[in-house]
Regions:
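Negatively charged
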Residues: 2-385
């Protein structure tokens, strides 16, 4: 554990210590000197007051179960800054609370990363108005069941990638008050939040965002998600954005501006609850990778991809693999002249009866027919007019 703080009082608690072997917690008064405290069985409170002329405090110890940082009467901790991606508490910590008034947080990237034992976290005293980077902040905090960030000021934050990735114990998360107007990276922001049943991101300002890859990947418990107001005009990567959101039955992405997107691979892979998708208005002129895009979308019966500009696409392998309920597919206007990989494109599409290919040139039509044969899909009518 590393907790760095120009402070005068630090209180911390060590609990759940068993056995007779003394355990050591070190308190560093500066970078070179330290005080060792031996902790035996039982739950104990400790307080260490730094001299006024000491500007740095670091606590370290693998046995720490609970951390409380608060201000004393005369002095209060004001800045919390971990050493370069260092956590301020170890993975064994169960509870952490930061109650100092007006705690000014400056650098919190990765600050609770991999704290898998953490069940309770009180950040009510944090002033986040100067924070620019929240990357990996709570990543793999798998035991957290609740988190109140409703009063946070995120107006200066530019990076939220991986922020809640792996928080599988959370069933709900209120981020509706987040100001995301400066955020450029939301990659894996809610990835692997497998316990989330609801998530309101409808008020997110995404006008600056360039990366949304795996943003909601493996949010397997989400039954609804409103992203219809997302401004995606600057997004370049949407790979795996909704991958394995298997309980989503409806998703409106028809208004997405995809004019700058190059990667859509795995975007809806495993979204087995979706029954239809209308992506006919998407600008795919810069897209090169769409492999596995709909693989495992076993609930899809209709898919409209007409009008797509696929002239720059190179990889289409497994795109519709295991879309077992798909009966019709509209690929009107497609151009596969630059495609180098179509492996298993239609494998498992056992219900497919027609593909609309109006406006497609003969080489593209021939490629599609050949791939249907390779994937052992028979009885499909190609409609060209």
């Amino acid at each position: 554990m590393k907790y760095v703080n120009p402070c005068n009082t630090v209180e911390f608690y060590v609990g759940e210590i068993t056995g007779t072997t003394p355990q050591t917690v070190k308190i560093y008064t500066d970078l070179n000197t330290s005080v060792d405290i031996e902790v035996r069985e039982g739950n104990k409170w400790y307080s260490y007051v730094l001299p006024k002329d000491k500007g740095l405090c670091m606590i370290e110890g693998d046995s720490v179960k609970k951390v409380l940082v608060k201000a004393n009467i005369s002095y209060e901790p004001r800045y919390i800054t971990p050493f370069t991606y260092g956590k301020i508490i170890p993975s064994s910590t169960v509870e952490a609370s930061f109650k100092g008034s007006n705690l000014n947080i400056t650098d919190i990237k990765g600050i609770f990363q991999d704290c898998s034992g953490l069940t309770s976290l009180d950040l009510s005293g944090w002033d986040t108005s100067n924070v620019t980077d929240m990357i990996y902040m709570f990543e793999w905090c798998t035991s957290l069941t609740s988190l109140d960030l409703s009063k946070w000021d995120t107006s200066k934050v530019t990076n939220m990638s991986g922020m809640f990735n792996g928080c599988s114990g959370l069933t709900s998360l209120d981020v509706s008050s987040f100001n995301t107007s400066m955020v450029t990276n939301m990659c894996s922001m809610f990835g692997n939040c497998s316990g989330l049943t609801s998530l309101d991101v409808s008020s997110f300002n995404t006008s600056m965002v360039t990366h949304m890859d795996y943003m909601f990947g493996r949010c397997i418990s989400l039954t609804s998600l409103d992203v219809s107001s997302f401004n995606t005009s600057n997004v370049t990567n949407m790979g795996s954005m909704f991958a394995y959101c298997s309980n989503l039955t409806y998703l409106d992405v028809s208004n997405f501006d995809t004019s700058n997107v190059t990667d859509m691979g795995y975007m809806f892979k495993g979204c087995s609850g979706l029954t239809s998708l209308d992506l006919s208005g998407w600008d795919t002129s810069n897209v090169s990778y769409i492999s596995y895009m709909f693989k495992g979308c076993s609930g899809l019966t209709f898919l409209d991809l007409s009008g797509w500009n696929t002239s720059n696409v190179s990889y289409i392998s497994n795109m519709f693999n295991d879309c077992t309920s798909l009966t019709s597919l509209d690929l009107s206007g497609w151009n596969t002249s630059n495609v180098t990989d179509m492996y298993s494109m239609f494998k498992g599409c056992t219900s497919l009866t027609s593909i609309r290919m109006v406006g497609c040139e003969k080489p593209t039509i021939d490629k599609i027919k050949a791939q249907l044969t390779k994937d052992n899909i028979t009885g499909v009518t190609i409609v060209t007019e």
